[in-house]
Amino acid sequence: MTRHDVITKSVAMLRLRRDDLIGKDLITKSAARLRLRRDDLIRVGRVIVVSVVCVVCVVMIASAPRWGATHALLGIREAPKANTTSAPLTVDQAKRILARTFTAAYLGETTSGAAAQAQLRTAYTGEGLRGVSGRVKLASVQLAVSASLLLAPHPKLLAVSRGFGFPRFIIAQTVASDGGLPILHLLVSPDAATPYRISMSAEMVPPATVEPFDRLSSGSPLVTNGTGPQLTNGTGLAVAPATLLNLYAAQMAFPAKAISKAPFVADSFAVQVRAGAAGAAGAVASQATYTQVHAVVPSSVYAVRQASGDALVFGVLERTDSFAVKPGENVNTVANKAFVLLTGKKLVTKAASITTLEFVVFAVPRSTGQATLVAAREQIVAGSGS
């Protein structure tokens, strides 16, 4: 074998080994499967490795509490803490809400049709909407409630909620231009997507007054209560708001139920309701058995702390007057125009019921003493008969 033959054979063997190695190279195989060149795949791998290292470094730096300067350099800031010592509304914003809401309420009660219903839904919510709907429906047979909201062109803003959580509230007072009793209004907003609407309105009971709240710029806090989404135990008050309203509802029942150590002072509204129940029972005694029960509407209770540490408690009771007609008897209901308008029935042979909402506001002392009724209103909202 000549020298030239030896060199040629050696070169051929080297090429064979190189081709064999290339065929077995993992990177080359991967590149072939991805339809990339081997060098391109290597570059991609390097970029991925560098990116992962950078991300890990940033995460470690951001999570280290001592790296304040690094946080600032990277633009990292702690989320701001919720402000619990100021009002979510300015005075001007609250007054604009009152103007918008009262305007819608006025239009809803002074117009008719679908537009009127839409205005009422804009102005009222919950039991407030049930009450005003009943009032509008019975306007032709029922004495008008002390003037419409807009007869008091400048509502007095008494309080707004504190903090930026929910629910939020506004408390306002109006005085009718014809000299009627002042009316307390509670407006609520349950969440960020729902505007403020009137939850309840009630005439003040003479000689009651409303003690001052904290300044409007700081807002007034809700007091914890036994029921409802916003309230838990009534700490710091002479009686828990839920307990107060449940006992008040129980003592107004007919037949009467004795309440020992009532946490509230006797008031003219309760006396009037009980007298009406006794009169109704006497009027139908020979024809039907009459009962009356009162129950607190779930989640209707709002207790707002005042500057003195006392609280103003808002709540709604649902009253049900029931008539069980005795066998062989008929009850003529023509005289009860509201019942006839709601049910279309002028004669009842089996049973009948009337549902009335009672809007009440109490002043509850901070530690000792009895609660005092500040405002009250009742409104028939439904009836049934057979």
Predicted segments with their positions:
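Secretory targeting and sorting signals
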Residues: 43-67
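Short beta-strand edge/turn micro-motifs at domain boundaries
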Residues: 67-75, 178-243, 306-314, 324, ...
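C-terminal region of N-terminal signal peptides and the immediate post-cleavage residues
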Residues: 58-82, 86
